Structure formats: structure tokens, C-alpha cells
């Protein structure tokens, strides 16, 4: 049986049972929405749940693609049966039309979305007194100027493991793009 890093962490810390809402290849809009939705569907869990969030790439943009069908299989690549709807994602680097549009700044949009998602969940967890830990599961190479600095500075780093940019991630991106 597949066990996510979050489930393994829960097992090590004796925080079982663990619940995995992740779905491979999805983005951060889905993380925020499904996390909040799960708590609103299970309000008794506000008082006894520790949450571990591994943030996806800022360039994976999610959308709802339809209802959950009975025949879908649960798991990292399958449907998550806890919800009546399912998500899909598109990746900005795979969409030529958006990268050619001079009115769209993909990197700034991705960074604003990323920080907004992080802050939304941090505020949600704090409001409901839910203990949590966040980390970068994928690239964290984000824009670092203008009004973005205000959003970046608002992130609570006490609950975010290794928040600052990762040179290792940057080197891998350079190598991949070479």
C-alpha cells in the first residue's frame, strides 16, 4: 500500500490514523480547497488534527473537471473519494498560448497565487487552532520583488520548514532547461 511522506511522518510521531488527501500531479489551489473542505465536512476534526502540507509547483494550476464517479480508484493518482468532485491541473510550461500572450506575466501570477494560497491556509489553521507544518514539496523558485515581498514577509516561517529559496532546486531547474 502506498504511503505518502505525510503518512510516514504521522506514523513516526504516533499521530495515527493518518488521512491523505493528496493527488499526484495536482496544484496548490486544490490543496487549499480540499483541505478546507475536508475540515468543514468533518468539523469534529478541528480539535484533534495535525496537518502536514507539501506545496506543489506554483506553475500547476487547477480546475474542477467533474463529479467523482463510483468506479474511480482511490490513491495518489486516482480519485479522492472524500469529495463529490475531482480536480485536474494544467501546467503553465505546457501551454504555448499563455506563454505567447504579452498581457500575461506567468511568473508573477504564479507567485501571487502561491503566496495567497499559503497565507489562506495559514490563516485558516490559525483561526481554527489547527497545528500544522508546511514545506516545499516541489520548486520554490518564486519572484522576489515589488508587492510580492509583502506577501512573502507575511508567511509564518515558524510553521514552514526551510521556507527560503533552495539553491538545489534552482540548479536542478537550470540543468533541466539546458
Regions found by a protein language model. Give the residues of each.
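Serine-esterase "nucleophile elbow" of acetyl-processing enzymes
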Residues: 1-30
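Alpha-helical cap/lid subdomain in secreted, periplasmic
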Residues: 36-178
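Residue- and microsegment-level detector for short, conserved "hotspots"
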Residues: 33
Amino acid at each position: 500500500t502506498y504511503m505518502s511522506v505525510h503518512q510516514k511522518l504521522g506514523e513516526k510521531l504516533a499521530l495515527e490514523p493518518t488521512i491523505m488527501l493528496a493527488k499526484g500531479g495536482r496544484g496548490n489551489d486544490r490543496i487549499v480547497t480540499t483541505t478546507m473542505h475536508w475540515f468543514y465536512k468533518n468539523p469534529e476534526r478541528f480539535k484533534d488534527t495535525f496537518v502536514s502540507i507539501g506545496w506543489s509547483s506554483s506553475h500547476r494550476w487547477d480546475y474542477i473537471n467533474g463529479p467523482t464517479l463510483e468506479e474511480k480508484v482511490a490513491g495518489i493518482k486516482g480519485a479522492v473519494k472524500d469529495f463529490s468532485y475531482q480536480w485536474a491541473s494544467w501546467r503553465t510550461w505546457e501551454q504555448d498560448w499563455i506563454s505567447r500572450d504579452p498581457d500575461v506575466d506567468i511568473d508573477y501570477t504564479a507567485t501571487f497565487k502561491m503566496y495567497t494560497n499559503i497565507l489562506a491556509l495559514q490563516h485558516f489553521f490559525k483561526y481554527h487552532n489547527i497545528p500544522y507544518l508546511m514545506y516545499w514539496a516541489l520548486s520554490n523558485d518564486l519572484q522576489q520583488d515589488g508587492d510580492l515581498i509583502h506577501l512573502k514577509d507575511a508567511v509564518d516561517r515558524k510553521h514552514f520548514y526551510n521556507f527560503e529559496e533552495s539553491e538545489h532546486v534552482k540548479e536542478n531547474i537550470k540543468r533541466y532547461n539546458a
